[in-house]
């Protein structure tokens, strides 16, 4: 049997790469299934194999971002390619994977390594993608100004390219998230409104559910819990979204807002739904977060729940969920202060301050 020329496989990989860049989930999945079995029949070429391995990781990241799928990754044994472009992709994709695992310092180091080769990448979309990934990481770390600086560069490029509307919408969501955290709610809503206009043209209902979650987050942060609950419940009506890992983010936020507006029965109903789901699909992070909410709201936040809350906070710290610990520490502190349990309140407020200092020490690109 004749071997397939590496150039033929490389051409297919370029088509796959373009689908990934455009955030075309179904097309990316189709091309992955088409090209993977052909590698066994290809003439040996380490550069093409390395290119495939890097695109496979980026495809997994796309499925996580666009459909909430988890993934595992092992560094390929044939990563001995020498071109600057492959080195760039290697550091970028490995950084994306470490960010997914909440290994922030490692991710930032890998992004810095990738940045050394960025000037050698002629594609403006690829440069915009780099800035968007870095912007999302710093948003997750609560370093909003740094995140905005990177994300603005991505928005500028994606606005100029009509084939990358979903990427533009994704960047706009990150812009909105930063302004939400900075309590600049009008700016945040304007970016989300633009994103929803773009999304309505794409007919991607999963992405629409993600946007609804972000509207819920915006309303929650601006003190409009009723509106937040409405948007979050609407997001969870999308069956595919409700089956994805993003379900846990929306369910947690929904339970939190229901407790805040004293709709205890509804909050407990969702709490039980999540607990049942967790028996089949364990998620240590979500379980710790909703159990903290249960302890401080449903059980009254009395002194006996303090050690339980502390234990769950430690679980979140072990998973490097720093932003969650900061947020929940403030909630717990406020709750214990309301109950005049000042020693317990002081502990959690101090915990929030420690996390703030930890995040500030994170290296900046």
From Swiss-Prot:
Keyword annotations of the record: Cytoplasm, Repeat, TPR repeat
Coiled coil residues, start to end: none
Protein origin, superkingdom: Bacteria
TPR repeats: 135-168, 169-202, 209-242, 244-284, 326-359
GO CC terms, sorted: cytoplasm
Pfam families: RapH_N, TPR_12
Database matches in Gene3D superfamilies: Tetratricopeptide repeat domain
Location in or out of the cell: Cytoplasm
Induction of its expression: Part of the rapG-phrG operon. Expression shows a slight decrease in stationary phase. Repressed by RghR.
InterPro entries for the chain: O-mannosyl-transferase_TMTC, TPR-like_helical_dom_sf, TPR_rpt
Phenotypic consequence of gene deletion: Disruption of the gene results in the enhancement of aprE expression.
Ways its activity is controlled: Inhibited by PhrG.
Role summary: Involved in the regulation of expression of DegU-controlled genes. Inhibits the binding of DegU to the promoter regions of aprE, coding for an extracellular alkaline protease, and comK, a master regulator for development of genetic competence. RapG does not stimulate dephosphorylation of DegU-P.
Similarity section: Belongs to the Rap family.
Protein name, per record: Regulatory protein RapG
Provenance organism: Bacillus subtilis (strain 168)
Species lineage: Bacteria, Bacillati, Bacillota, Bacilli, Bacillales
């Amino acid at each position: 049997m004749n071997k397939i020329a590496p150039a033929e496989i490389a051409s297919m990989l370029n088509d796959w790469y373009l689908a990934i860049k455009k955030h075309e989930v179904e097309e990316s999945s189709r091309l992955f299934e088409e090209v993977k079995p052909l590698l066994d029949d290809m003439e040996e070429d380490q550069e093409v194999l390395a290119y495939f391995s890097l695109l496979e990781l980026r495809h997994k990241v796309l499925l996580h971002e666009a459909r909430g799928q988890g993934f595992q990754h092992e560094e390929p044994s044939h990563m001995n390619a020498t071109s600057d472009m492959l080195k760039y992709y290697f550091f970028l994709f490995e950084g994306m994977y470490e960010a997914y695992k909440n290994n922030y310092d490692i991710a930032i180091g890998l992004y810095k390594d990738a940045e050394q080769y960025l000037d050698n990448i002629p594609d403006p979309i690829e440069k915009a993608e780099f800035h968007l990934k870095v912007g999302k990481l710093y948003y997750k770390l609560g370093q909003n100004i740094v995140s905005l600086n990177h994300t603005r560069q991505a928005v500028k490029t994606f606005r100029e390219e009509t084939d990358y509307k979903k990427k533009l919408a994704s960047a706009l969501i990150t812009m909105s998230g930063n302004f939400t955290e900075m309590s600049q709610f009008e700016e945040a809503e304007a970016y989300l409104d633009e994103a929803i206009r773009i999304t309505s043209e794409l007919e991607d209902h999963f992405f629409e559910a993600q946007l609804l979650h972000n509207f819920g987050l915006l309303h929650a942060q601006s003190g409009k819990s009723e509106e937040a609950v409405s948007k979050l419940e609407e997001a969870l009506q999308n069956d595919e979204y409700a089956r994805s890992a993003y379900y846990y983010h929306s369910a947690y936020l929904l339970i939190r807002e229901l407790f805040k507006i004293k709709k205890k029965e509804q909050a407990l109903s969702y709490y039980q739904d999540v607990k049942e789901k967790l028996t089949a699909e364990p998620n240590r992070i979500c379980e710790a977060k909703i159990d903290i909410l249960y302890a401080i709201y449903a059980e009254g936040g009395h002194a006996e729940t303090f050690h339980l809350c502390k234990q769950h906070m430690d679980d979140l710290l072990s998973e490097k969920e720093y932003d969650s610990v900061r947020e929940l520490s403030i909630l717990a502190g406020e709750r214990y202060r309301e109950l005049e349990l000042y020693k317990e309140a002081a502990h959690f407020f101090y915990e929030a301050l420690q996390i703030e200092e930890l995040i500030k020490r994170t290296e900046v690109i």
